[in-house]
Curated annotation (Swiss-Prot):
The keyword Magnesium applies. The Asp-Asp-Xaa-Xaa-Asp/Glu (DDXXD/E) motif is important for the catalytic activity, presumably through binding to Mg(2+). It holds the Pfam family Terpene_synth_C. It comes from Coffea arabica (Arabian coffee). Mg(2+) 1 binds at D321, D325. This is Linalool synthase TPS2, chloroplastic. Expressed in flowers and fruits.
């Protein structure tokens, strides 16, 4: 039972507290090299925590108050559906669509007509319908855009006069599946002309912000909770805003933020109880960042238990990653991997002290999660969780072996291991047992075969990680575990920029397969499939401006503050 916090603070106090938090510094040292330049994993330098946990636990805003929740329900009743497609789009971007999931699906299921009937509505409406229906798993053929081409099969240049339509076609193109040349052409055509229009300043201020935002990262790739915070400000400045919808969005954001703060407080108490921060002084102590990851993957308020469990998973992954990446010797790592694989608590006396507490923390967490599943669902999930952790540790061990030997694998060898070592498959397996009820053994076996949506999600986050954590000009000199850029450069002889370009191409290809996997029938719930997609989105988000997970530059910190600690200001 979560104890009711004794301290509530206003938005202004939260802002002041947040500025104190943001002044904290964090360093994350990689591999150390001695004077002889031999690789050394043992690190005696502690990692200072990146957030003041006592201050974090005191943060509250008044929007957890019951009267705001009641007001939110009242606003729901007052809403009028005027333009269905635009309303659905606004609900999604404002972070409100989870209130109306069944209604939205019913609407999208009912509005589809033949291609010829939709085309007269113009590029904007056609692109919007295409994007929304594909997002929700409905079949929509790429040929819906054929009528917007000229006799040569190219998109009509007259479309450039419809800036909003051009923008929405650009966003729709990122719902592309494999072998959809129309959408690939659409993406290239729209990106080229939107950049030109921006450069020539032939655009109004309201649309300019949307275009710049989309060109930086398309909507389909964005973390939706963060997008909601950004879009609320954009929507408020619009002349056609719906004041009821705007107020509901602000209230809902603040209410959900208060719920998230409560979840964070619970996980901070758990983390403190493990003692890992004190015993593993070499490891990163980044619970707030771990929680931010989880919020990005499953933010809806009703999934609090899943958020808390998955944040614990992320914390254990971070600690074990640092054992392999920063501290353990090769012999120690082989021994730890063996103990995890055998799941043998009686063997921990063979481990050094820092590994004993690490394994016991993992062992206790998995058994506790499995106990709850057995009690509530009657299913023993320990074998599945054991396998997921063993697979992760074996992938970490392979990377450590490459490091100690100085070996740089081929790109394919690297990726075959790295899509597991990024930890996404492990997180997704745990998520299944948090969000898909009742647990079905046949579904779990299907999950164990690594359904395409899981592999694609993992590959996207791995490639985004490698692009973000490999600073330009430093990547080829790194003494760390080789990343995909080094592997590609060594294998092909290409320059670093060509390697980055190829990785960006692989990300687009993985998204195509992900889009396909979302529309194919599978035994998984829409919530679970959405989680897998959101894992990929978090990869794009966290590594968009470098390594937002490990190094606290201003952009990731500002995002965390706005999402977790700063309520939206009071209404006029």
């Amino acid at each position: 039972e979560v104890e009711e916090p004794k301290t509530k603070i206003s938005a202004s106090t939260a802002e002041a507290s947040s500025s104190r938090i943001s002044s904290a510094k964090m360093t994350a040292d990689g591999t150390i090299k001695l004077g002889d330049q031999s690789p050394l994993k043992q690190s005696e330098k502690d990692h200072p925590v990146s957030w003041d946990f006592k201050l974090v636990q005191s943060l509250r805003n008044e929007y957890a108050d019951e009267r705001y929740i009641s007001r939110s329900a009242m606003l729901d009743q007052e809403m009028n559906v005027v333009n269905l497609l635009e309303l659905i789009d606004n609900l999604q971007r404002l972070g409100l669509s989870y209130h109306f999931e069944d209604k939205i699906r019913s609407i999208l299921s009912g509005i589809y007509n033949t291609i010829k009937m939709r085309n007269p509505e113009g590029l904007y409406a056609t692109a919007l319908e295409f994007r929304l229906r594909r997002q929700h798993g409905f079949y929509v053929p790429q040929e819906i855009f054929e009528s917007f081409k000229d006799e040569n099969g190219d998109f009509n240049h007259s479309l450039c006069e419809d800036l909003k339509g051009l923008l929405y076609l650009y966003e729709a193109s990122y719902l592309e599946k494999e072998n959809e040349s129309n959408l690939e052409m659409a993406r290239e055509f729209t990106a080229k002309h939107l950049k030109k229009i921006l450069k020539e300043k032939r655009i109004d201020q309201e649309l300019e912000a949307l275009v710049q935002h989309a060109l930086e990262l398309p909507l389909h790739w964005r973390m939706m909770r963060l997008e909601a915070r950004w879009f609320i400000d954009i929507y408020e400045a619009r002349s056609d805003r719906n004041p009821i919808l705007l107020e509901l969005a602000k209230l809902d954001f603040n209410i959900v933020q208060a719920i998230h703060q409560n979840d964070l407080e619970c996980t901070l108490r758990w983390w403190s109880s493990t003692g890992l921060a004190e015993k593993l002084s070499f490891a990163r102590d980044i619970m707030v960042e771990n929680f931010f990851w989880t919020v990005g993957t499953i933010s809806d308020p009703q999934h609090g238990n899943a958020r808390r469990l998955l944040t614990k998973v992320a914390a254990l992954v971070t600690a074990i990653d640092d054992v392999y990446d920063q501290y353990g010797t090769e012999d120690e790592l082989e021994l730890f991997t063996s103990v995890v694989e055998r799941w043998d608590v009686n063997s921990i006396d063979q481990l050094p002290d820092y590994m004993k507490i690490c394994f016991l923390a993992l062992f206790n967490f998995v058994n506790e999660m499995a106990y709850d599943a057995l009690k509530e669902e009657g299913v023993n999930i320990i074998p599945y969780l054991r396998k997921a952790w063993a697979d992760l540790c074996k992938a970490y061990l392979q990377e450590a072996k490459w490091f100690f030997s100085g070996h740089i694998p081929t790109l394919q060898q690297y990726l075959n291991n790295a899509w597991t070592s990024i930890s996404a498959p492990l997180v997704v397996v745990h998520a299944y047992f948090c969000v898909d009820y009742p647990i079905n053994k046949d579904h779990v076996e299907y999950l164990e075969k690594c359904h395409k949506i899981i592999r694609c999600s993992s590959m996207i986050i791995r490639l985004a990680n490698d692009l973000g954590t490999s600073p330009e000009s430093e990547v080829l000199k790194s003494a760390d575990v080789p990343k995909s850029i080094q592997c590609y450069v060594k294998e092909t002889g290409a320059c670093e920029e060509k390697a980055r370009e190829y990785l960006r191409f692989l990300i687009i290809e993985a998204w195509k397969q992900m889009n396909e996997a979302q529309t194919v029938d599978s035994p998984f719930s829409s919530t679970f499939k959405g989680f897998a997609v959101n894992v990929a989105r978090m990869g794009q988000c966290m590594y968009q401006h470098g390594d937002g997970h490990a190094h606290q530059n201003s952009e990731p910190r500002d995002r965390i503050l706005s999402l977790l600690f700063e309520p939206i200001s009071s209404f006029a």
